[in-house]
Amino acid sequence: MHHHHHHSSGLVPRGSGMKETAAAKFERQHMDSPDLGTDDDDKAMADIGSQARVVGGVNAEKGAWPWMVSLHWRGRHGCGASLIGRDWLLTAAHCVYGKNTHLQYWSAVLGLHAQSSMNSQEVQIRQVDRIIINKNYNRRTKEADIAMMHLQQPVNFTEWVLPVCLASEDQHFPAGRRCFIAGWGRDAEGGSLPDILQEAEVPLVDQDECQRLLPEYTFTSSMLCAGYPEGGVDSCQGDSGGPLMCLEDARWTLIGVTSFGVGCGRPERPGAYARVSAFTSWIAETRRSSFSDLD
């Protein structure tokens, strides 16, 4: 796969000549804005761990995607998630479905580069104290495959751990636009789990085309899909819940949450994602809803 090295510090392409640290850039860009059960097609890992990398990807540079989270269930990677604030993650509903009452089995691993280096000094591990699955989630149709996780303790923002911007309702990302996916999921359909975080570039696909190429599903306005007609680059089992992100005004913006697909990287079978912009008000309401009266 043709791939260009795109950035060193997470928020700005490397060619921009900026010497600012990611943390300083974060302060500048974000501090003024307000905190804004699985099935074959799901891209989560099965409990046995025999299911789970980005297909056609390359090793990410360390620190390239500081909002990337590895969600561990009973001590092993099961899904991805994105950090969207000091104590909130966005992931896929199917990752947490049926496991949302067993909070003690979950841990969120942030600042991670390789699964084998969990004890690296950049890594921050947090327990989860609340999981909220979107009430419109439908396991069969894959509608509203999105969930939020609240961390027991907020993370510390560092060069390695930073939140991603969320796509707003009015932002339009046209078909053909190249965006990035990342994850520790399988490197091929039925393939193995990588140690190092993988990333790949995929073009966004027109909504009608998504429906045509994924006729088994009703492709709604709260979904989007991405991939090459010839296949070969895609998210796969173990990538679910992770980010589909586009560089917009020098900021990485989360536009999709890895949701489902038919196989991985097959020609004419783009990967499907929950469309973040369709859920921005739900995300904001969930953040605001008081914490104490729900527990």
Residue spans for each PLM region:
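Extracellular trypsin-like serine protease catalytic domains
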Residues: M68-R74, R177-D295
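Active-site substrate-binding loop(s) of clan PA
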Residues: I132-N138, P154-P194
